[in-house]
Amino acid sequence: MTTLLSISALLITVMLMQMGTGALGPLDTLSAIELGFSNIQIGVIGAAHFTGFIIGCFGAPALVRRVGHARAYIVTVALSITAVLLHPIFPTFWAWCLFRVFTGLAIATSFTAVESWLNAKLTRQNRGRFFSIYRLMDMMGALIAQSLIVILIPIENLSYMILAIILC
């Protein structure tokens, strides 16, 4: 029980991170449609996120080793929040591609920092149990993110601000 309490903030953080980034993709798609982006442009914007995610997967371990779990997480969350907040300020195709690369990179690095921290904190006896709780929180965040789309208004600054607040 004490282990669960010690990692509960981390588990809630994972859920919120997944909520914020999970809602960004659909919000970007709906906003891009309203802005008149072509279907190909919308697809490229979506792919840009995963391009950044792949880059983050390769670069994250070195960053975590170099600066530590907490600093790596904080820097990448700040990058993600900045990229989210820039969407309504620069509503252009190339800017959104760049922002989505940044969010993908940031999320991959954030997940790497969290998961490696958990691996370091947990023991062989409780790792499976706590990683199942971790995945449950992760998936709950993704599920809630899809429900957020109902209240988020495409292109509105407020919608992107809400996602940035959730990511904080």
Annotate the PLM regions.
Residues G68, I89-W94:
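Helix-breaking motifs and short loop linkers at transmembrane-helix boundaries and internal kinks
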Residues T3-F50:
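Helix-loop boundary and gating motifs at the non-cytosolic
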Residues Y160-C168:
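Symmetry-related core transmembrane helices of the 12-TM Major Facilitator Superfamily/SLC fold
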Residues T109-L122:
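Intracellular juxtamembrane helix-capping segments at the cytosolic ends
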Residues W94-F102:
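Paired small-residue
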Residues G56-G68, I153:
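Helix-to-loop junctions at the C-terminal end of transmembrane segments
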Residues A78-P91:
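C-terminal ends and interior cores of transmembrane alpha-helices
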